[in-house]
């Protein structure tokens, strides 16, 4: 039992899962597919690994990745996203309360109602529980955008232009422009992990695009 939670920088957890898969299963190839927070995490992992990434990891596809955590946090704090922010904070509060039962006296939710956005939450919980100086320090160190140039396997990033959760900093045009491995696509629609298309088989455009990229 540990106080830590899943967050945008827990690449050690991802590494543990990957190594377990490599050592215990007979996969010919492993593909990293990430959505939203998991997309940022996948990019952060691959960028940190660079040329040292396990040889079985052949490709990666991510959708709606908040590559710039500060920019995404500021976007979510806007009034237009109030309903989303409230739902996120309610869900996080439930996780805090569950941890309080598991580890009484080590964490509390006193005055939790004063937390209004991710900056408040990250300053109070994420940063101190995971060794960061502040929310700003956490965002800076765990944003994947500056690690993208170090990715050495074919990787597709798809961030819709109408995604309500991500801002300009989350469209890594500059970081991908000179890369021979990372490709950025910015479709006009798709929202945040939406990419719905009205087909009889009920398939998502994102599913079809991912398969297309992996087969290319």
Q: What do the PLM-derived regions correspond to, one by one?
A:
Residues 151, 157-159, 163:
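Short beta-strand/loop motif that positions the catalytic acidic residue
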Residues 4-25, 44:
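Alpha/beta-hydrolase active-site loop
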Residues 25, 29-129:
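Alpha/beta-hydrolase-fold enzymes
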Residues 1-5, 196:
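Glycine-rich "HGGG/HGxG" loop immediately N-terminal to the catalytic nucleophile
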Residues 124-147:
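Active-site nucleophile elbow and catalytic-triad environment of alpha/beta-hydrolase enzymes
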Residues 190-204:
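Catalytic histidine-centered segment of alpha/beta-hydrolase-like enzymes
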Residues 145, 161-164, 189-191:
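Acidic beta-to-alpha connecting loop that harbors the catalytic carboxylate
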Residues 177-193:
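Catalytic histidine neighborhood in serine/cysteine hydrolases
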